[in-house]
Amino acid sequence: MAEMWISMGPQHPMTHGLWTLKVKIDGETVVDTEPDLGYIHRGVEKICEARDFTQITTYCDRLCYASANTWSHAYIYAAEDLLEVEVPERAEYIRMIAVELQRIASHLMWLGAYCPDVGNLTGLVWCLRERELMMDLLQELGGSRMHYNFPRVGGVKRDLPIGFAMRCKAKLKLFLDRIQEYEALLDESTIFLVRTQGVGYAKAEEMINHGVSGPNVRAAGHNYDVRWAHPYSVYDELDWEPSVERPSIKGSDCYDRYRVRVEEMRQSALMILDGLDKMPGGADTHYQSGDPAIIGKAPARAAEGQTGFHHFEDSRGESMFYLAGGGEERGKHPYRVSCLLYTSDAADEGLGVDLG
């Protein structure tokens, strides 16, 4: 059969409107790709330079609707580094719970979109069913189903609702049972295995050279997770290790990348359960900083030349925020905001070109 080019887009692999992907195919085999990015460039960094440090959180929620909590937390940690703000331990545990719930919800969306692409519509329905459990818990924390605006400089918006720990534990234990159903559905499906095993081989060295991080590089056997390599929040107080696959000599395939995400969902659920048990409580614990310059108002200005930086483990890979203070001239607005927000996705797309 003659090779031909077809256009997939402008679209995102699972939604619409974000990029165009031209694909060269030979029958059912993709032999080359040409990605064209930048369809929804919004100038978020420049917008943030005209906002104070508290207002910026709202924009970060909208950087990725499937992982809103991740990006707002990544920014907050950079802002706290810049402003030299200390965060209560209870607030850090609450943040960890919110971020890991978001990771599970994001991975469920990934797997739910992946299943019908390889001929398993049931997987989509099941994943969306369990994603609702996570969305309900996130809505309890932030008051919204998508844009939570939950973290604050110095803590979080509110403490855990009454009875949240009990409800969260019950739903996570149910979810851990449902993960076994996913594995039975997919790992025992001949069609799923044929369409994922031996497809899209990539070695860890190739991924690292392309800047790929997150689950994809761990699926290739590279043991790098920001939460483990450079612990932040309370991750060094939890009982866990990064989920890493052991691929074949040819490298990781699509099946390995599915497996690592399933293990990460199980791992995140166990981390939350561990955190709920270890979280400090009582009248002397707080969910916000006790600094009167922080609570309920925009934080004080950052000195000119002062910088803040934080890198964060998003559900798709490593994300980073860099902030620079502007002193008296900029007031409570940052001089510069730089967010490497789509680094992992863009790197994955670049690797896809080579794999093609």
Enumerate the predicted regions with their spans.
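Intrinsically disordered terminal and processing segments
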Residues: 1-5, 90, 97-112, 250, ...
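Structured beta-strand/loop patches that form or line metal/cofactor-binding pockets in enzymes
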Residues: 2-26, 37-40, 226, 232-235, ...
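N-terminal cap/recognition module
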Residues: 29-72
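Internal, well-ordered alpha/beta segment that forms a basic, Gly-enriched binding/recognition surface
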Residues: 64, 69-184
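Intrinsically disordered, low-complexity regulatory segments
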Residues: 123, 127, 137-299
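Conserved small/polar residues in nucleotide/adenosyl-binding loops
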Residues: 342-349
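Hydrophobic alpha-helical segments, chiefly the membrane-spanning helices
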Residues: 353-355
